[in-house]
Amino acid sequence: MLRAREAVRTLPSYHPPLAGRQGLRLDFNENTIGCSPRVLECLRRLDLEQLARYPEREPVEANIADFLGVTASDVLLTNGVDEAIHLLCQTYLEPGDEAVIVVPTYSMYRIYAMAAGARVVGVPSGEKFKLCAETVLNRITERTRFIAIANPNNPTGTVAPPQDLLRIATSAPQAAVLVDEAYFEFYGQTMLGTHRELPNLFVTRTFSKAYGMAGLRAGVLVGNGDQMPSIRRVSSPYNVNAVALACLPAAIADQNYIQQYVKEVLDARSALERTLKAHEIPFWSSQANFVLARIGASTADSAAFVQQMRARGILIRDRSADPGCEGCVRITLGPQAHSAKLLKALQETLDELRVVQGASRS
């Protein structure tokens, strides 16, 4: 009988709640107003002959490399950051190797590492969800071959200082160290450049968040030029579709659009944090386009809150299943108009839940 590999049979399933997403989508950290008008114009003017030809990635990689200030040989365009994670695991992990992941964090680090046959070593973050470099260093062994750190982290929005990331990378030269900068635009600090001196350091960026192109599935993997040929051997030569490749130059050319969107998101983030503080709801200071807040003590509390917000047309994400996140929800931020709708629904939901809780105690 045909059977999947044991590593695959034991994989945890990742099923994001994609069904029934009617309303204001503040649950997946997407750009809530969409991509740049230049990208839309590019789509309208798309040469249909491009769809009949295999996509040519290299010219766009050179364009992206110039935008990032790195050499083209250091850049690989990927089918979203997910593929970049997969490629690193396929390139560097052998069965029985160890992958170090600071939790809570993005689920696909664990899944791709396990699929490669690695043993995942989960390192709990501190009370404030801050990465502790010493704790990570203490979990690194001679079997460690992959270390994944999202910076800013998802779902917490917290960040690790560059010096800590450098310490980790220099302390584990035998491991591929990924710094996932999917939310870079909302934070502004990067590890790009250090990859030239550290051949085991890799940085990823995405066009799914600030750029509003999640449906086109485009990401960037940057690494030392000596390492990238090995990763290219694992990658499909046609991994990024022609439509995405046609749109990427237009996307990076319109930085005014990105900067204005980011400014509105940061303003909305501040407004949400002020509101949460006023209601004495615990939250973690975020450097991303979302905020993680502890609505209650249990999964039931966060589930009830998510349902009440959904009833008001606002979708947010229940993160109670993540380590240390019991009773927590993650709320994506958008421009001013969306922020106003969010805060109104938030106030109404909090008022209603207080009434229900008060009635249950009486």
Which residues fall in each region the model found?
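Conserved PLP-binding catalytic core of the aspartate aminotransferase-like
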Residues: 266, 278-312, 329
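N-terminal small-domain helix-loop-helix segment of the aminotransferase-like
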Residues: 2-82, 87, 353
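Active-site phosphate-binding strand-loop segment of PLP-dependent enzymes
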Residues: 127-181, 185
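Short acidic capping loops at alpha-helix termini that bridge into adjacent secondary structure
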Residues: 71-75, 95-98, 143, 181, ...
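PLP-dependent aminotransferase class I/II
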Residues: 200-284
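PLP-dependent aminotransferase-like
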Residues: 91-149
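PLP-dependent enzyme catalytic core of the Aspartate aminotransferase-like
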Residues: 308-312, 317, 321-362
